[in-house]
Amino acid sequence: MAEEKKTTRKKIQAADKMNKIMADYFHGLNEAATTGKRKVAWCTSVGPAELLRAMDFDVYFPENHSAMLGATRMSTDLIPAANAIGYSPDICSYLTADIGAYLKGITPLVKAYPGIESVPKPDVLVYNTNQCRDVQDWFAWYSKKFDVPSI
């Protein structure tokens, strides 16, 4: 029988700094959304984030939240909630996982960043359909839920 090799992991040198950067980012978004001291814009991955930052918005990317849902193995429990309200199982799982998480009131941000209870409430939703057409429907849904403009 072949001898099993033990896998060892070497911590990436920048991990602690990156963890702090991400914690500061999400806590900043949370503070902006809960206090109203700063405006929050949701933006798609190839949206005009630089322009939004230049207009003094704190920018949140729902696709990153969906990636967290997938990485934490939560998506499979959340996608059916979006399917149940009419979203096809054949469309973007980022959309359906994220909407499912909203419908169920859960997010991995709670565990990753103590003190954060939900995704930040947007003041505006800004998208670009260059990467996919589904983001228009995704942001339109949230526009109705949060009663904010989607452009």
Regions from the PLM with identified roles:
Residues 1-151:
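An N-terminal assembly and electron-transfer interface module characteristic of large anaerobic redox
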